[in-house]
């Protein structure tokens, strides 16, 4: 591509350990980033912004600590720190073009940060600032990138996903309270089963979200252990022994999250099990959301030829050829997001295995998939809460009609007349399209008043064993 540009003024010459290289005149990056741009024209997708911002935090913390340790002149460190914080604030996202499919250590992205920050800092000081010797002082891509993944993933989960889940849970609980007295037909194997209330059905969804929140919070505890200071392979070569611990303290202050210096930095570089675990929690959440979304789709199906228990908010025309058709578009989007997150987890699982000896070499892929999953889940959870749960309506006439004809209500008579006799009643009620109460009156010795009590759907939602002349026990 660059050979097509005839105007040499559009380039400048940059130098790295491999020699000279032409770089676009206005680019903040240098030779190593340019080499990566030319080496990896693969997907057209650059590293996630959250990851780039985490690199900014790390470089700011490193400059501050290196100055405190007397390893970096304070005026230089001040400018590096300021430039790095600008990167962390997202002011230079466009200057991080390196493809996600790059060197497995993420060195190209680390050097992208080093070069951009060095350029910005030099503009302020007018003094030479080297991306390796100064910005990357006391660091290696091998400890910086795993640290950046953990920071960015933690920020994404705590800042977006967990609040979204809390919001969804609150909306589900609010609707459950409002619909608590409405009884509906339960279903197992997609077939009619015993009754339950909408509050009980919604409560199961809420419990799934509660469990997802708990699992995520538990996993985050392990993500808070940062391997910064391990440098190349975990030994801490070419860094001050106090650098890692001190830098992590600064990172905690910058992000507002209590991070810790990993006790075993070899693990933090060579193994990414905690990141695979986080991906697994995303996977489990995706499964839960897919279940909830599919329940909503089934309950909304129809409105005439399906279950038709609820009516979801009409958000857009559903068909380009069938007038008046409205589809459950948000639940469908939830299903697609869940499918993608499950796919991401497969990629992260394979990537987690791809570390030989002292370094995992699929770190950019892990970073991309984790942060993409967190973003997708956080966004779609909010939509599910605000565009579906809040506005759904129960079609009580339809729910009551189906409930009254549900032959499975006869299950409550098992302790009194036996399973086989109850089955006869259920089959006859279904075959003759009659309420089970009518058929039970004809097929049993129980009087209608007693049968009405025993087959009361509301009472059946409370469980227990029902006997003649008494309630559930």
UniProtKB/Swiss-Prot annotation:
Catalyzed reactions: (S)-malate = fumarate + H2O
Keywords associated with the record: Cytoplasm, Lyase, Tricarboxylic acid cycle
Annotated site location: Important for catalytic activity: 332
CDD domains referenced in this protein's UniProt entry, alphabetically: Fumarase_classII
GO process annotations (BP): fumarate metabolic process; tricarboxylic acid cycle
EC numbers: 4.2.1.2
CC annotations in GO: cytoplasm
Known pathway: Carbohydrate metabolism; tricarboxylic acid cycle; (S)-malate from fumarate: step 1/1
Cell location: Cytoplasm
PANTHER family, per the entry: ASPARTATEAMMONIA/ARGININOSUCCINATE/ADENYLOSUCCINATE LYASE, FUMARATE HYDRATASE CLASS II
Protein name: Fumarate hydratase class II
Organism from which the protein derives: Xylella fastidiosa (strain 9a5c)
Gene: fumC
């Amino acid at each position: 591509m660059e050979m097509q540009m005839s105007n040499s003024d559009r380039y400048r010459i940059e130098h790295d350990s491999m020699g000279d290289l032409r770089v676009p005149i206005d680019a903040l990056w240098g030779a190593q980033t340019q080499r990566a741009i030319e080496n990896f024209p693969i997907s057209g997708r650059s590293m996630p912004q959250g990851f780039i911002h985490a690199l900014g935090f790390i470089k700011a913390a490193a400059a501050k600590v290196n100055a405190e340790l007397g390893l970096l002149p304070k005026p230089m460190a001040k400018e590096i720190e300021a430039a790095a914080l600008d990167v962390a604030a997202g002011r230079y996202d466009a200057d991080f073009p390196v493809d996600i499919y790059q060197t497995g250590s993420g060195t190209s992205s680390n050097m992208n940060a080093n070069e951009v920050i060095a350029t910005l800092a030099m503009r302020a000081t007018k003094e030479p600032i080297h991306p390796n010797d100064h910005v990357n002082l006391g660091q290696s891509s091998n400890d910086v990138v795993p640290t950046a993944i953990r920071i960015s993933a933690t920020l994404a989960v705590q800042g977006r996903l967990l609040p979204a889940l809390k919001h969804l849970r609150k909306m589900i609980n609010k609707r459950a309270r409002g619909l608590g007295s409405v009884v509906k037909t339960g279903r197992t194997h997609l077939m009619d089963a015993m009754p339950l209330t909408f509050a009980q059905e919604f409560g199961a969804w809420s419990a799934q979200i509660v469990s997802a929140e708990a699992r995520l919070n538990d996993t985050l505890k392990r993500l808070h252990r940062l391997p910064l200071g391990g440098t190349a392979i975990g030994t801490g070569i070419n860094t001050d022994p106090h650098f890692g611990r001190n830098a992590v303290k600064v990172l905690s202050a910058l992000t507002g999250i209590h991070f810790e210096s990993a006790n075993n930095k070899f693990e933090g570089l060579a193994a990414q099990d905690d990141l695979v675990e986080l991906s697994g929690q995303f996977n489990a959440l995706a499964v839960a959301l897919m279940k909830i979304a599919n329940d909503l789709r089934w309950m909304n199906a129809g409105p005439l030829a399906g279950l038709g228990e609820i009516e979801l908010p009409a958000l857009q025309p559903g068909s380009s050829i069938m007038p008046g058709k409205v589809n459950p578009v948000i639940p469908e989007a939830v299903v697609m997001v869940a499918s993608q997150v499950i796919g991401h987890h497969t990629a992260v699982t394979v990537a987690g295995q791809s570390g030989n000896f002292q370094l995992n070499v699929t770190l950019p892929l892990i970073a991309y998939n984790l942060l993409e999953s967190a973003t997708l889940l956080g966004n779609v959870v909010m939509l599910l809460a605000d565009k579906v749960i809040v506005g759904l309506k129960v079609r009580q006439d339809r729910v009551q009609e189906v409930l009254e004809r549900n032959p499975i209500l006869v299950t409550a008579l098992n302790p009194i007349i036996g399973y086989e006799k109850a089955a006869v009643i259920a089959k006859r009620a279904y075959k003759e399209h009659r309420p089970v109460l009518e058929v039970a009156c004809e097929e049993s010795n129980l009087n209608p008043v007693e049968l009405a009590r025993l087959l009361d759907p509301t009472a059946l939602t409370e469980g227990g064993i029902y006997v003649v002349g008494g309630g559930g026990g």
